[in-house]
Amino acid sequence: MKKDYFEKFILQNIKKNIIPKNKKILITGSNGFIGRYLVYVLANIFKSHNNLIYGIDINKNLNFSKNYIYLKKDLTLLKKRHLPSIKFDYVIHLAGIPSPVYYKKFPLKTIYLNAELSRELMEISKKHRSNFTYFSSSEIYGNPGKENIPTRENYNGNVSSIGDRSCYDESKRLGETFTYIYKNNYNLNAKIIRPFNFY
């Protein structure tokens, strides 16, 4: 997608009033497929909103603008005490290992990023009263039968807890459970986004 077309599409389809202003925003997985676009939208297209964007990713990232701070970190090697000690207004958790090749190779890191790190970020968000967004996956539905395609949002899923894919599917489900608990039991302003495939 060409840069100018992308910017035009965003400006035509996203209302400016839904983008926050003068906020500190943490994005994990900031150089992933979704993360880099989100950073670009917030830091460049809506740079007049004067948000300060912090991006954490293991991979090298380009500094899009002066209001973007890139932190090169491997989140699988960190505990919450090593996360930025900044009071963020928004925490958007995108970091993960979505590729079957890699999550089969690194199942425990996959579980950590999807579930355990999610909980640590929710604890930080609860303490600072941040808004928290958890990026889940359509994989939480598993393999729905024909009668459940197209799949309804309230479909409980057909997922095996044992198998090569289970480390990803089940940890995403647990991440959603943590989000539900923190929202309903601890009044965390939390949301779940459950994307299907992106192109």
Describe the residue ranges of each PLM region.
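Active-site Tyr-X1-5-Lys
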Residues: I162-K191
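NAD(P)H-binding glycine-rich loop region in Rossmannoid oxidoreductase-like domains
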Residues: K79-L113
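Glycine-rich NAD(P)-binding loop of the Rossmann-fold in SDR/ketoreductase-type enzymes
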Residues: Y90, F106-E120, I162, S166, ...
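Non-catalytic terminal and boundary segments that flank Rossmann-like NAD(P)-dependent oxidoreductase
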Residues: M1-I25
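Conserved Rossmann-fold NAD(P)-dependent oxidoreductase catalytic core, especially the SDR/UDP-sugar
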Residues: R119-R165
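Flexible, glycine-rich beta-alpha linker
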Residues: I140-N143, S166-C167, L188-Y199
